[in-house]
Amino acid sequence: MTPDKKVKILATLGPATRGIDDIRELVQAGVNIFRLNFSHGDHTDHAQRYQWIRDVEQQLNYPLGILMDLQGPKLRVGQFADGKVLLQRGQALRLDLDPTPGDQRRVNLPHPEIIAALEPGMDLLLDDGKLRLRVTARHRDAIDTEVLNGGELSDRKGVNVPQAVLDLSPLTAKDRRDLSFGLELGVDWVALSFVQRPEDIREARALIGDKAFLMAKIEKPSAVTQLREIAELSDAIMVARGDLGVEVPAESVPQIQKNIIGTCRALGKPVVVATQMLESMRFSPAPTRAEVTDVANAVAEGADAVMLSAETASGDYPLEAVQMMSKIIRQMENGPDYQAQLDVSRPKAEATVSDAISCAIRRISSILPVAVLVNYSESGSSSLRAARERPAVPILNLTPNLQAARRLTVAWGVHSVVNDRLKQVDEVCSTALEIAQAQGMAQRGDTLLITAGVPFGQPGSTNSLRIETLI
């Protein structure tokens, strides 16, 4: 398949995808990596979808990434004797550890770590932020609150505590079981929910090891304030705007998104923008103008990938949603200002040979009429560095490592082809010319920039650059 866009598409699978033919259509429409959402479905469902993806990957000879998204802790109130209550502004409400069904005056909060972390003056958000409570007093096993924003509260609605860091692991017992299953299955990426601090990444990394790559979901205010440390410890970042938009003021989300994208690009870490990008396409064959603009802005800001959630998992128009997202991406990338916007936000290179090579590639490709940049890389690290530079031409990543190729399905502008292990620079050059032409990325007379690392087989050793013409 010949790449026709640089920003990647991550699509969530669910009941809307009924078989291998649906998967193939989504890939041909522009999907590069699929998300298995472990908040829904069972292991049998996920195993079936995993196999469909791998079958399509083999049929199309096109590396596809698979990301498992762990559910993470779910903080909820308990139940009410009547199933629900109507809370009035200004009234008092106690939240406690007593499992007895609640009423107008109190309700169970089965999370002692929340009670321990809250102080008078802090706020709690209930039911995705629809209700807001302010803590007036804390006791050993309860907190007293005043209702600031009232409304109906029913059984087991969610709780958010944006002003506190909880003494809580991001991995529940369910997550650990799911993670073990996913790693055994062979997923390429693991998305970690409920990240509050860098230590959460270290905890997950200890369990994952080198079996998959780790994507941290930024959805907590404490993660935003420690973003750089978290990103340095992760392989990629997801801007999870759903919970993030509950825990911070909605008007802050666009600037936070922009800052996250800039930080990730400076660190050379792929960044995915997610949540409600084409939400109306769950039930409509066409998006709203605001949704189109949302996707376009993420592309313009330099995101590596954009994600579809319910649109492809359970919506009525999964294929149309992918097709629309691809159209928006291509329209933006072909616009007159896209490259200039990326150039303005280009990060400063580090004083390393590999970074110097990546910068040289970008400069040369802006001077010469280069058709494609070709990296031969066993780990994929040199192609990630090249992607950070956001060159004006596509990046062809040649690798003998299928896992590396799947990892790069989330990286901006990188198109991977798995080939035999090469041992000489001349062999790399001849193979690059052959594959670039076969992939439809170059034709006779085109100029190619080709990089490799000598000695071969050492990750991160890129130190050679050649300019070749396809004859």
Predicted regions and their residues:
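Non-catalytic helical/linker scaffolds that mediate oligomerization, partner binding
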Residues: M1-I471
